Curated annotation (Swiss-Prot):
It comes from Clostridium botulinum (strain Langeland / NCTC 10281 / Type F). It catalyses: 2-formamido-N(1)-(5-O-phospho-beta-D-ribosyl)acetamidine + ATP = 5-amino-1-(5-phospho-beta-D-ribosyl)imidazole + ADP + phosphate + H(+). NCBIfam families: purM. This is Phosphoribosylformylglycinamidine cyclo-ligase. The lineage of its organism: Bacteria, Bacillati, Bacillota, Clostridia, Eubacteriales. Keywords: ATP-binding, Cytoplasm, Ligase, Nucleotide-binding, Purine biosynthesis. HAMAP family: AIRS. It is an enzyme of class 6 (ligase).
Amino acid sequence: MVSYKEAGVNIEEGYKSVDLIKKYASKTFTKGVLNNLGSFAGMFELPKYKNPVLVSGTDGVGTKLDIAFRMKKYNTVGIDCVAMCINDILCHGAKPLFFLDYIACGKLESEIAAQLVEGVSNGCIQSECALIGGETAEMPGFYRDGEYDIAGFAVGIAEKDEIIDGSKIEDGDILIGIASSGPHSNGYSLIRKLVEDLHKDFEGNKIGNTLLTPTKIYVKPVMKLLEKYNIKGMAHVTGGGFYENIPRMFKEDFTAVINKKSYPLPNIFSHLMSLGIEEDHMYNTFNMGIGFVLCVNEKDGENIIKDLIEMGEKGYKIGYVKKGNKSVELI
């Protein structure tokens, strides 16, 4: 007789990982959570809204995970997973409610799984949302030893008449960029081609650790700004950089004019460019130091930047909107 364990699935290790994961998930629970982790489904009670709309998003971390495997550092990529989902739904003004994760591996190691979920938990705490469920799949022979994949699913809520969809954007509105923490979770297939020695020094740290800096989560500053200002459009700068993501906030045919010299370019991007990437390709691939973009009325610009600074963020007027063809023009 062949056992499940002999086939490569360790049920006992699965039980152990669930116990380790529960303590991290419970730290994220908010008032709306109705049941504990381990049920067949997570349940969440909706707060009182007049005309609520649920806003959802799903994403993963991509090949940044390979850097984590090679550095044997697993407790930050969970933050990336949350950030990639949460920042997307934030673009429509949604307040995050809850999050679910999915972890897949060839051989389950409970301590590594727990570190991954520790990162997810930290990301949820930063996002003020609850981790109410997830799945850990052990699939022997499907993944190479020591490799994991992680993805997530986020749900937020917004009043229907307060959803930000870009329909109020006008010619002459300005664009405010909020600084990123590095490459975030995009462009790592290219980075891995160029950076072979992850233990090489970069500004007093191993470059592998620098590349594992978690994706910034913009929930707290943006939700505070939404209480005070008429924000007309928002963009999460991910894969495709400025060129692909900023036009996604436009409902009509506008062009975003971005001044490359309006903010300081972080050294990690200058370093990557020095390894052989053309500048235009950099802007087509990376966030180039700006992880989130707001489209606002010009009269609010200075006050928004001031508020961002007071909240510990770096905000810059990076450009403006003009009539065009859903494109980005760099100057």
